[in-house]
């Protein structure tokens, strides 16, 4: 019966007009990939959208205002793939917000501090080496998610390489600092991978990773299989245990971007992109599970958009100017930009 309900829901939603963005950013020069929203706690209207242009050698990290205009371009970077932000990372005993980028062809992370006024500076010009000792492609970092552990404020980076084996695909590093120099210390490897690709015999990949800091879960997209869920804390007694696999069916394209729309008391949504040419769909799941348990997270909606072949996306529930219930940012491939949607329009499509 549940399967029938889902099929009927998808058929109805497929007939709906696609969501219209409230705004769009200026284009990046080459090849957009992943956005990350930074909230300015002192002045939310001055919040920013960080976004990658993943061109080899001449790529960059682009910083946009909420009206879509460019504030800053950090170039050149050598195929910067994905970006994430975290708040209150301790550097020299002082908290600072950070944006961390995977610089794929340099096999490292780039870490940028975000001042209270939104100014951005490089905290580790030489970068932080990751995936050391791995063969070609397996030593290229693509996906990244940052996790701030609630009990002690420790900050971790969870990194997904370009390729890997069927186990221990993800690498988790604790970020720290010694005598003013940043460090990335490997604390664990974890995560199953189906190796399913777009065609038989071709190995796929894992790129999208997101952490729900408050609830302590990490999700990642095994692109042709499903969305896998684990505990984010490397010290958890069940850290190696897979908790659930979401989205095993109904996707028409790759399972790509992931983001958490977080509300108080664990409410909210896990948002995933179903990557399609000119018609990427938003796949929405309950953040806190169902009456059956926290890891029972059935598909709630498949919402059509006009975004083109979306890789990365991000979302916030913080009210912002023009976005009273929060903001959703989606990569838009052919126009080489990022679309900014009001969450109000998304919520209107939810059951």
What are these regions (language model features)?
Residues 66-107, 128-129:
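Blade-loop segments of beta-propeller domains
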Residues 22-59, 81:
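Beta-strand-rich domains and repeat architectures in extracellular enzymes and scaffolds
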Residues 312-351:
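Blade-level signature of beta-propeller repeat domains, shared across WD40, Kelch, NHL, RCC1
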